[in-house]
A protein has these predicted regions:
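Beta/alpha (TIM)-barrel catalytic core signal, keyed to glycine-rich beta->alpha loops juxtaposed to Asp/Glu
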Residues: 120-260
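Structural motif corresponding to the early beta-alpha repeats
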Residues: 71-94, 116-121
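Short, acidic/polar
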Residues: 28-41, 91-106, 164-173
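N-terminal binding-site loop/beta-alpha segment at the start of enzyme catalytic domains
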Residues: 1-76, 187
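CE4/NodB-like, metal-dependent polysaccharide N-deacetylase domain
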Residues: 95-116, 148-152, 183
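Active-site mouth loops of central-metabolism enzymes
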Residues: 20-32, 82-95, 131-132
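Acidic (Asp/Glu)-rich catalytic clusters
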Residues: 7-12, 43, 65-77, 104-110, ...
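Structural preference for beta-strand elements that scaffold enzyme active sites
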Residues: 5, 12-16, 47-48, 75-81, ...
Length: 260
């Protein structure tokens, strides 16, 4: 398995196992199958597992907890996240801490390597238009809360999900202290699909470039654009759903792939 330096976590496998599948986000599967998938990925050399409470309402984290029962294999790195929104400043740390403690219980651990803000970061003047965490709140309250969790030894580092309003994401990457990593859209369509909840154009390549220039680790997400870049979608979607639209746009890609 090829490895790469990632976000201060040292060498990790180039491939990451995302928790959406084992959390049944993309369709129903059994707990036993999910546990077997996780163990098979680790046996194959994948040593970075990306999880979140929202992946199956905690199911992905429970799969991890069942698979390893608190005895995490040496060298295995894993993440979790918190969808924070826009609470009052004095509620930021309590909400992050509560989410983290609930994740610990499901994961059967007392520390995670990387803790992501799962909310979209938005400009302060966009709170009436977009759902997410205002950048001012992020700077004043979220970053200090993350740094406190690092100092307490409960997280190795903190990171952001870079699918918010692009300018706010870029400002966060370029600020100090900088995140250890950013999750960025990385697919052949440059499409965030249904995860895009703002009016501005998506610029994932600019976000990746800015992170690379700053030494911020990049975790590519939506590599097959939620199924739009695969041979078939595994679920029924309305014709105007972003993933269905992208699936039709990707028809030439599928034709070319079939020739190879």
């Amino acid at each position: 398995m090829e490895s790469r330096e990632f976000g201060g976590l040292g060498q990790v496998s180039a491939l990451t196992l995302g928790g959406g599948g084992i959390g049944q986000v993309w369709g129903a599967t059994s707990r036993d199958e999910s546990v077997a998938t996780l163990r098979a990925a680790v046996d194959a050399g994948i040593n970075l597992i990306d999880l979140a409470p929202s992946y199956g309402d905690g199911e992905a984290e429970r799969v991890f907890g069942q698979a390893f029962s608190g005895s995490v294999p040496t060298g295995l790195r894993f993440t979790t996240k918190c969808r924070l929104g826009s609470p009052a400043p004095d509620q930021v740390f309590p909400q992050l801490e509560q989410s983290l403690n609930e994740s610990f219980e499901r994961l059967k651990v007392d520390r995670v390597d990387l803790f992501f803000l799962h909310s979209q970061i938005i400009p302060d003047d966009s709170v009436d238009r977009y759902e997410g965490t205002p950048r001012g709140l992020f700077v004043a309250s979220v970053m200090p809360a993350f740094e406190r969790l690092v100092s307490d030894g409960r997280i190795g580092a903190w990171a952001i999900t870079g699918i918010g309003v692009p300018q706010a994401v870029l400002e966060t990457i370029k600020a100090e202290p900088q995140p250890a990593a950013v999750q960025a859209i990385a697919n052949l369509l440059d499409s965030p699909g249904a995860s895009k909840r703002y009016d501005e154009a998506a610029i994932p390549r600019d976000i990746i470039a800015a992170a690379s220039q700053r030494g911020v680790g990049v975790m590519g997400i939506r590599a097959v654009q939620a199924g739009a870049l695969t041979s078939s979608l595994d679920r029924e979607l309305p014709e105007d759903h972003p993933e269905a639209v992208d699936y039709r746009l990707a028809a030439p890609f599928r034709s070319r792939a079939a020739e190879l």
